[in-house]
């Protein structure tokens, strides 16, 4: 038995989908444990590019089981669209399993998300997908789960009760039109019936696989710095992308987690508002954004760009228990005369090495950089660190030293062949 968790160790968009897809080759089960359709991942399979939001990357392998765990908030409409998209492109989905305990995103969640964000003076940068309101209902114990969605009478009763309260908020607080009960019930009950064949107790599926000695890969969404507890609160998501979220969001005990792979870029990116100490506002930032095609998979918003921040990565290592790193997008830095790594912050005249919780302190933090010479050589063909130009080797090795975690995979381009194994996590 072996289990590996793939987590984003920055602010999301680190290339987790590609790494998960790469590690899926030796996995028997691939499971999502949190988030919803607010974060997309891009996978290149058989020369074709696929963009998924809910379905795990393992769906492309017919001999593997793909799981949407109980910690995910699920929009049935988005999921049906994604399944149709895969079917239209010749991808079978018989290997998908959906937790009966996952909570369902309904139209009032999306409308409330939009209305709340519009009303705020300070924007969090929501994707308007209803994720936050769905998790709020879950915490308030009024959420509707997949198991409820499949039961005609229970769904009818819960939806009726919820809609009374939601329409009060929508109409009286946000001056929105009320939602129609019959329209929602008919549409979403029908969607639930379309998904019924995929629904099961996924905790049993995953634990049975582990007990049988199979390899299980857990796939997170977003990143550690967007974690509701350990991220840049309140500019965070509504769930726990950290590795600890696996136990809650998939129904697997912590003693069954063996490895945690932290995925990161060779620089840093962020979508939406919030602290970003190493952010670049110059031509170098623009160059990295365009070279790296740094635009959101779901939102299409241009991502904010900054230098690699080892303070952030050490924070991710500590709170998520990273055992190895997966370094992506090294090729994007090719051609820069100088590359920088943030090794610490200056705060009120003091050098600090840990990420502050206070937004006031974060705004006052000035990055302390190490400057290293860049490289001009094409590295997209390199298949090991030893094949990299000397300056690129120095950069990679220094990143690992500052973070204190070994690099297990190194990517020098978007294709699978450009992802190089330096250490096999399944045999570690």
Curated annotation (Swiss-Prot):
Binds 1 Mg(2+) ion per subunit. IMP binds at residues 13-16, 38-41, 127, 141, 222, 237, 301. InterPro entries: Adenylosuccin_syn_GTP-bd, Adenylosuccin_syn_Lys_AS, Adenylosuccinate_synth_dom1, Adenylosuccinate_synth_dom2, Adenylosuccinate_synth_dom3, Adenylosuccinate_synthetase, P-loop_NTPase. It catalyses: IMP + L-aspartate + GTP = N(6)-(1,2-dicarboxyethyl)-AMP + GDP + phosphate + 2 H(+). Keywords: Cytoplasm, GTP-binding, Ligase, Magnesium, Metal-binding, Nucleotide-binding, Purine biosynthesis. It is an enzyme of class 6 (ligase). It is found in: Cytoplasm. GTP binds at residues 12-18, 40-42, 303, 329-331, 411-413. The active site is at 13 (proton acceptor), 41 (proton donor). Its main location: cytoplasm. Pathway: Purine metabolism; AMP biosynthesis via de novo pathway; AMP from IMP: step 1/2. Mg(2+) binds at residues 13, 40. The keyword Acetylation does not apply. CDD domains: AdSS. Its EC number is 6.3.4.4. Its cofactor is Mg(2+). Signal peptide: none annotated. One of its GO terms (molecular function) is adenylosuccinate synthase activity. Plays an important role in the de novo pathway of purine nucleotide biosynthesis. Catalyzes the first committed step in the biosynthesis of AMP from IMP. Belongs to the adenylosuccinate synthetase family. PANTHER family: ADENYLOSUCCINATE SYNTHETASE. Homodimer. This is Adenylosuccinate synthetase. It comes from Levilactobacillus brevis (strain ATCC 367 / BCRC 12310 / CIP 105137 / JCM 1170 / LMG 11437 / NCIMB 947 / NCTC 947). The lineage of its organism: Bacteria, Bacillati, Bacillota, Bacilli, Lactobacillales. The gene is purA.
